[in-house]
């Protein structure tokens, strides 16, 4: 896992670095999901500004380019309907996080359906982002999803209680939980669990293979009211 997050800053961001690359990669991802028979997809991305030789891209432009690519794809293939979730990175400052909230509001009518907390779980200090997620909860129809307990360092009761206080509609990964937090999730009622089996196994975020994944435990207790969603990273 420590080698995973640097891939974005060291490689991926340097490859997807202009409008053409953004459009190309978005359409390629959509095609892969359509070919797999997916009919409804939610993509997530962290808005970023890009300095490119072909022209600088603002965070607003970044989101618009991706939404335009989605619209372009859906015009050619009606099998797949796609919506967008904008992510706040744990490394973001509060002003940067509030900018993402504002982008969600601006693009909600074009297909942005949610806001996410993502990024390197080793980055502490996320309590500074609380005002951004409280602002997001005030936007009617906007869902809130959070990367949750994906690593031991981000699985402390203190952090997880903070995240639950943001009133998320869904939480992702949900690996490193105390029994107290697990019960708190159940007590919340109808909070969606976004479980990423392939990511958790191949990135060695859990011990054991697919048969050891905590999906089975939650599935066997699905009568307790937590909807399960299978996701890919």
Functional labels for PLM-detected ranges:
Residues 147:
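Short HxH-centered metal-ligating active-site micro-motif
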Residues 1-142, 150-170, 175-191, 197-233:
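Metal-cofactor-binding active-site regions of metalloenzymes
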